[in-house]
């Protein structure tokens, strides 16, 4: 099948890695458990608001030597700025989720950190090997790069864990 052909291409050096990227965890878990993958990309499940990939996927990937890329770290915008983009999973966020995101934002602001910077760094802290973000402008790219070196105190991470 297709996976056999991909493995052959990898062995021949035609491709360097075999990867699968999905937003739904169930099929991604199955691929991670059964397929000869090098890397997986999860979307929106290793975030400050949704940590299901941490619970269900990271250990399995590590045990099989599979790298993890986190995408969708803003959960459709709410973790970039809850008031400017109150969306979660491409829909209007409900009041409880919006309030939770605002609490996270306030915790960050109290310590001089943007919520977006914490959202981008969170998956790396939890075991992801890389993060994918989308930028619309060069200024957004610059902000993401600057955020990677922003000082985020350990005390903030601890507060975000329980928020």
Which residue ranges define each predicted feature?
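Beta/alpha (TIM)-barrel catalytic core signal, keyed to glycine-rich beta->alpha loops juxtaposed to Asp/Glu
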Residues: 1-162
